[in-house]
Amino acid sequence: MDYFTLFGLPARYLIDGNQLTTRYQELQRQFHPDRFATQPERERLASMQQAATINDAYQTLKHPLKRAEYMLSLQGFDLGNEQHTMRDTAFLMEQLELREELDAIERKPDAETLLAEFSRRVAQMTTTRTQQMVEQLDAQLWVQAADTVRKLRFLDKLQQQVEQLEERLFDDFA
């Protein structure tokens, strides 16, 4: 059973987060290992496995990028373990330039202001790519969606680096 079916959700990218959380809580109550404490070992193990599956499914569907990767995995794309080389050289060059720009920001006197603007740009790029990915997933353009997810991974990593720099700048200021 796929994760969408487990939670009674349609297998699409845009899902109802409240419905996901409500169903997660219901399933957690239903399969909580404590409810099976007095049952035979086989049933206890089955409930623990089911609870673990429910947790994995919830974490996957709750996180937008993981949800997209999971949808693609249902179509045979294993993005989690791939060693796929990005062929979009323009995108790769843009990423190199962005990382160089981020590295340079740290050494500037107005780093906080520059970093805030940089972060807004990365957020806008992420929003644009996410909209593109949603359209591709809805249209079942799996190859294109997989490529867009790979690009979103780059942007996600870049955003994490922005946050790390924000923390360093804040620590230096404090």
UniProtKB/Swiss-Prot annotation:
Protein's UniProt name: Co-chaperone protein HscB
InterPro entries found in the cross-reference section: DnaJ_domain, HscB, HscB_C_sf, HscB_oligo_C, J_dom_sf
PROSITE patterns listed in its UniProt record: DNAJ_2
GO CC, any one term: iron-sulfur cluster transfer complex
Top-rank taxon, per record: Bacteria
Disulfide bonds: none
Self-association state and partner proteins as the record states: Interacts with HscA and stimulates its ATPase activity. Interacts with IscU.
Keyword Ribosomal protein: no
Any Gene Ontology biological process: [2Fe-2S] cluster assembly
Function comment: Co-chaperone involved in the maturation of iron-sulfur cluster-containing proteins. Seems to help targeting proteins to be folded toward HscA.
The encoding gene: hscB
Record's keyword annotation contains Chaperone: yes
PANTHER family with a match to the protein in the record: IRON-SULFUR CLUSTER CO-CHAPERONE PROTEIN HSCB
UniProt keyword list: Chaperone
Alphabetical list of NCBIfam families matching this protein: hscB, PRK05014.1
SUPFAM superfamilies: Chaperone J-domain, HSC20 (HSCB), C-terminal oligomerisation domain
Domain (J): residue spans on this chain: 2-74
A single MF term (Gene Ontology): protein-folding chaperone binding
Family stated for the protein in its record: Belongs to the HscB family.
Signal peptide feature range: none
